[in-house]
């Protein structure tokens, strides 16, 4: 940071407080940046900032020159490291029930699995909810075979990043933490060896006729 810059830190459960504080500073004439990991519009701060603006009746907030700059979300970063597992239709689902009922998550998982969509899971597990990934996998296994490919990307783009490919039959909640992005392949997702000893994972662009 430069000497004239000030950092305002909050934890990940204070998004709305951070967004409102940013508008208060910006409305007073300060230049403000709300920093968010990944892409700010994907399970990140852009939605909180817009929600704060939408709820506000402060005319000064409405006059703030607000811009949202895209980034690389964890699903895209992990997919790029693995190859192209998101090469066909896919969906992104947060398994956190902090802001939505678990019943809604179950419904979305059921329909996504039945539609044979590739799925990328954000917030797959935490100390407060260690059971949810296991419950999600039970739903998915009703529609997907044990040989379905799975990609686990942990801290992709950061020091110490790890990438692992395994099958749905091999996946257990113990292999995942809150910093892991989980990609569940479709029936068409496949893999083949790389010359360096690794492997590529991709989902073909076409889908066989039903």
Give residue ranges: language-model regions:
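Class I SAM-dependent methyltransferase SAM-binding "motif I" and its flanking Rossmann-like core
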Residues: 41-115
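Conserved beta-strand scaffold positions in the cores of enzyme catalytic domains, especially
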Residues: 6-9, 66-68, 92, 150-152
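Class I S-adenosyl-L-methionine
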Residues: 1-66, 209
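A short acidic, often aromatic-flanked loop/helix-cap motif at beta-alpha or helix-coil junctions
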Residues: 13-18, 74, 98-100, 157-160
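A contiguous loop/helix-start segment that scaffolds small-molecule binding in enzyme catalytic cores
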Residues: 31-32, 114-210
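Short amphipathic alpha-helical segments
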Residues: 1-2, 46-48, 80, 132-133, ...
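General structural feature for long, well-ordered alpha-helical segments within catalytic domains
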Residues: 14, 18-21, 45, 49, ...
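Short, surface-exposed amphipathic charged segments that create phosphate/polyanion-binding patches used
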Residues: 21-28, 80-84, 105-109, 163-169
